[in-house]
Amino acid sequence: MDVFMKGLSMAKEGVVAAAEKTKQGVTEAAEKTKEGVLYVGSKTKEGVVQGVASVAEKTKEQASHLGGAVFSGAGNIAAATGLVKKEEFPTDLKPEEVAQEAAEEPLIEPLMEPEGESYEEQPQEEYQEYEPEA
């Protein structure tokens, strides 16, 4: 009987040790998983921020080019229609610089709404969740 009890005791110790190792292994695995997820999340966030900044810069550049073309075109139209003489049109202005300044300056007065029109958000109906049909 002594041998039997000693054998069970040893088995019990082995099970406890295995459980402890398993618990430790699961904890380590969970910690590494968490680190991995946080790493991927931070890299994704950096990529998104960099992408948004890049798109914003390209948009600003394109707006500057478009503004320059509009400015130049407006001068040509004004001269062609006789509103101003070609000689009176300032020659030292560079359309790209004027467009760049216009893009960087904030509006002095906010844009006004046309009379009688309202741009308030319409009330939303309550969201209703639908279950897919089987």
Swiss-Prot record:
Task performed by this protein: May be involved in neuronal plasticity.
Compartments (UniProt record): Cytoplasm
InterPro entries named in the record: Synuclein, Synuclein_beta
Skewed-composition ranges (Acidic residues): 98-134
Family as reported in the entry's similarity comment: Belongs to the synuclein family.
This protein's UniProt keywords: Cytoplasm, Phosphoprotein, Repeat
Region Disordered, residue ranges: 97-134
GO-annotated molecular function: cuprous ion binding
GO terms classed as biological process: chemical synaptic transmission; synapse organization; synaptic vesicle endocytosis
Signal peptide start and end residues: none
Species of provenance: Bos taurus (Bovine)
Free-text tissue specificity from the UniProt record: Specifically present in synapses around neurons but not in glial cells.
Gene Ontology cellular component list: axon terminus; cytoplasm; neuronal cell body
Gene3D superfamilies assigned to the protein according to its UniProt record, in alphabetical order: Helix hairpin bin (1.10.287.700)
Protein name: Beta-synuclein
Annotated spans, 4 X 11 AA tandem repeats of [EGS]-K-T-K-[EQ]-[GQ]-V-X(4): 20-67
Residues annotated with Phosphoserine modification: S118
Cross-referenced Pfam families: Synuclein (PF01387)
Description of post-translational modifications: Phosphorylated. Phosphorylation by G-protein coupled receptor kinases (GRK) is more efficient than phosphorylation by CK1, CK2 and CaM-kinase II.
Gene label: SNCB
Sequence repeats: 20-30, 31-41, 42-56, 57-67
